Amino acid sequence: LLSLPTGNIMVLWSTCRTSVLKSVTNRFIKNLACSGICASLVCVPFDIVLSASPHCCWWIYTMLFCRIAKFLHKVFCSVTILSFPAIALDRYYSVLYPLERKISDAKSRDMVIYIWTHAVVASLPVFAVTSVSDVYAMSTCSESWTYSLGHLIYVIIYNITTVIVPVAVVFLFMILIRRALSASQKKKV
């Protein structure tokens, strides 16, 4: 359990400690590492306890704790997904325009703020619908969605804005980078 955040802590430590590594790229990498650390320290222990022995810790099943844990789980997962397009954008500018100023510090800070804001706003409905329920004489912490139009709209909007578009953006930048590198190789020959 203690080894889970170790890799991300090492990444965070090395990018913060070394002045050469204080760049826009590393701001995005630090953001990704922070999300991973938070998930491994907050969400993973909760999930392990629930999976291993649902009877052991009654306090986990309080409504507030249950809601906070599910909400944070969704936030950290969303931040992780949303960080990849920012890294892809930075890589795109670094490869295609290596000698120019790419993304400013202010813009990269704004992008990180946007990532966290988007993740929190997109995860708020989970906080609202999470509850403690009894299943087979055991309390469980779960999302209790009513299968309604509102739920369908939330799922569609969340998946489009937080999963599909970010993944598509990453693929787009990778294709553009590949195309640019292929074109530069053809010019050399």
Set out the residue ranges of the language-model regions.
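Class A (rhodopsin-like) GPCR signature focused on the TM5-ICL3 interface and adjacent 7TM helical core
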Residues: S83-V95, F127-Y136, I157-V189
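Intracellular signaling interfaces of 7-transmembrane GPCRs
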Residues: L12, R17-R27, R91-M111, F171, ...
